[in-house]
Each structure stands twice: as C-alpha cells, then as structure tokens.
C-alpha cells in the first residue's frame, strides 16, 4: 500500500452527513455478495461487474452524492499518469474499533483496477 497524497473531502463528508439513514441499506445485494461478514454499513455509488470493459451501473448513492464525489474522484485521478474511470465507488461506515482487515480482492474488475481508500475520519 502507498500513500498518494492529500484529498479534500470536506464537501463530500458534509453531503454524506445529510443523507437519510435508509441510504445506508439501499443496496443490500452488493453488501451481501461483496462483504457478507463485514460489520459495516455501506452506500454504493458505482459498480462495474465483469471487468473494466463492462458498463458501470449507477447505484442508489449516486444521485444524492455524485456532485460531492466528483471532485474527490478527480483529485484521486490526478495522482495517476493515464486517464481512467471510476469502476466502483462505495462508502463504508465501520463501527467503533472495527477496521477492514487486509485481504485480496479478486474478479476481473478488481484485478484490473487500482483500489483507493480515502478515510473520512
């Protein structure tokens, strides 16, 4: 893992805090499929299944969060030399003392992508 640099998440975090509780449970099929044992609540914005050539679906979190998410995504993209696109985007809310354990992602989309984690706190 390497540190890319600073990313201003002020606007994204403020927008996130304004969202209704139901948004955290809106896309449960992805939570069950991708991290069934993780004790987190998740808002999914974008999901690409089947590899980077496949279409990217906008999920429930996209409409309320995309305007605040776009500057974060653009800043992250600025750390890479070649232009790409966001294949997956999600926000995970972990409980006190919880973390995401080190793991290996698999599947055509994740194997072809850079995974970037931006801590909100």
Where are these regions (language model features)?
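Non-heme Fe(II)/2-oxoglutarate
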Residues: 1-82
């Amino acid at each position: 893992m390497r540190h890319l640099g600073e990313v201003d998440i002020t606007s994204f975090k403020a927008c996130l805090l304004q969202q209704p509780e139901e948004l955290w449970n809106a896309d449960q099929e992805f939570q069950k499929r991708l991290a069934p044992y993780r004790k987190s609540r998740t808002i999914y914005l974008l999901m690409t299944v089947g590899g980077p050539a496949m279409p990217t679906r906008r999920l429930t979190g996209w409409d309320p969060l995309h305007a605040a998410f776009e500057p974060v995504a653009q800043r992250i993209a600025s750390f890479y030399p070649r232009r790409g696109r966001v294949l997956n985007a999600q926000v995970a809310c972990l409980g006190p003392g919880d973390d995401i354990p080190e793991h290996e992602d698999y599947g055509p989309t994740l194997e072809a992508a850079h995974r970037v984690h931006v801590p909100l706190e």
